UniProtKB/Swiss-Prot annotation:
Record's GO cellular component terms: cytosolic large ribosomal subunit
Naturally occurring in which organism (per UniProt): Methanocorpusculum labreanum (strain ATCC 43576 / DSM 4855 / Z)
CDD domains attached to this UniProt entry: Ribosomal_L18_L5e (cd00432)
UniProt function note: This is one of the proteins that bind and probably mediate the attachment of the 5S RNA into the large ribosomal subunit, where it forms part of the central protuberance.
GO annotation (BP), single: translation
Lineage: Archaea, Methanobacteriati, Methanobacteriota, Stenosarchaea group, Methanomicrobia
Name the UniProt record assigns to this protein: Large ribosomal subunit protein uL18
Length: 174
């Protein structure tokens, strides 16, 4: 609570550590729709958000849980699932008439090859225009699950499953 004029109460979402308003302002001033990528422990969530004066509007929403409908049998929170979710997002966004956006990873740490960048790479590979540097994106072996299949023989068919799911997602674009 403010006691005198020298005390400044921060916005609630800033106090909770949920929003970086400086970053949000720079993204909104760009004038482009935001491709918002969020990760949980079990899923990847991608949304296309348009900022308006009366609030933000969700234009396209994709959750990695939807990959099961395309035949994906792997874990829904790993790098291949993030890549496939990004592809599914790009297909749905293009069908809705949106060609591009600007990446918004929020307060997540931007480390090379992270799941959020796998999702962005999936969207870029499916034809969605997102300005991103190639150096921070994960390589193709991580996106198709080769590192997981190499680690444990129980996941030997993961690479083929990722490729089959990728083909099923791209068929939705047609």
């Amino acid at each position: 609570m403010a006691i005198n004029g020298r005390y400044f109460v921060q916005f609630r979402r800033r106090r909770e550590g949920r929003t970086d308003y400086y970053q949000r302002q720079r993204l909104i001033v760009s004038g482009r729709n935001r491709m918002v990528v969020r990760k949980t422990n079990r899923h990847i969530i991608i949304q296309l958000i348009a900022a308006q004066m009366d609030g933000d509007y969700t234009l396209v929403h994709v959750n990695s849980r939807e990959l099961v409908n395309f035949g994906y049998k792997g874990y829904l929170g790993n790098t291949p699932a993030a890549y496939l979710t990004g592809m599914l997002f790009a297909v749905r966004a293009q069908k809705a008439g949106y060609e591009g956006g600007i990446a918004d990873i929020g307060l997540q740490v931007a480390s090379t090859g992270a799941r959020v960048f796998a999702a962005i790479k999936g969207a870029v590979d499916a034809g969605f225009d997102v300005p991103v540097g190639e150096a921070i994106l994960p390589d193709d072996d991580r996106c198709n699950g080769a590192h997981i299949a190499e680690y444990d023989e129980r996941f030997a068919g993961l690479v083929e499953n990722v490729e089959a799911t990728k083909d099923a997602i791209m068929k939705e674009l047609e």
